[in-house]
Amino acid sequence: MNTFLEKNRNVKIAGLAVAVLMLIGSERVTAQFKSSSFVPYSSVSVGLGTSSYYGEMAPYSRPLISTFGMMRWNVSASYARHFTPRFGARASFTWARISGDDYKLNNGDRGFPINFARNLHFRNDLKEFALTGIFKLIPDSRSYDRRPQWSPYIFAGIAAVAHNPVARIPDLDGDRWVKLQPLGTEGQGSPGDYPKAYSLVTLAIPVGFGVRYKFNQRFDLSAEVGFRFTTSDYLDDVSKNYPDPNVLKDDLARSMSNRSAEPTAARKGGDRTTGLRNFLTQQYGITDAGIDPFVAIGQTEYATPGTLRGNPARNDNYLLGNIHLTYILGSPIKCPPLK
């Protein structure tokens, strides 16, 4: 029970932020509808930017390298309705790629030797549909053409995210990427005390801030940073324990579940010999230079069934940074009534 509460604490905090923002917005809407001074308007935007993943392969304890070490891209499109001078709502679609690699982030003197030994990697193309409320710190004037030159804002909402993590198979089997969820790399769906396969759709709570610059009467340029708290610990296909390899469905599932004995890092290549020798020395006191480290790792208790493969106490999350080009649709012209 404590693990469940700890794991969902961030989502609850983010949910509270959403509720507060929506409450502020609802009060503003009520106040503004009592006045006819502001003319609501709409806008459409396209954007591109960066994406960073946080999880088993990119821990919060190393914020800089986790944010920038495996930074990838995102593209987005959105529609927004501005109801009052301060409050608006936005519907958006974002395609974001996230990625992680134990070898890259833990090779050499940096990082965690135990993560280097794990030798997992992944990439995941996220398809996010989000509904967010926007609160402008500097209010608009009564019409869109009189909006301020600079307008900082905060936002929060809810999102549905479709995902499907993949990884490159060992180099001896050829250069191709495979979907990880059907393999059940932690025993998902196998007989015995194993969980069912994880869902490829998850909920997320987007929260963030940005600043909008009025380029001219119809166009804005904005910069935005938003963090996504998700309800999934499987964006990277890593969460709990190593399974009994005998329950996995085939050799491919076994090779993708435990990659500690691979001589080469599969995602981009790279000799793992020195790093694995260092891990065996630090963790198990194995110092014999004549021992093959890729054989020796299999003779230790590392990655035995039931030992930790991930961190089940915390879900995976991601951060998006965006530049948006926005076109103001304006408001319909109100014709005087015919008499």
Which residues does each PLM region occupy?
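Extracellular loop and loop/strand-boundary signature of outer-membrane beta-barrel proteins
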Residues: 60-66, 115-122, 141-143, 190-197, ...
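Surface-exposed strand-loop-strand hairpins of Gram-negative outer-membrane beta-barrel proteins
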Residues: 50-78
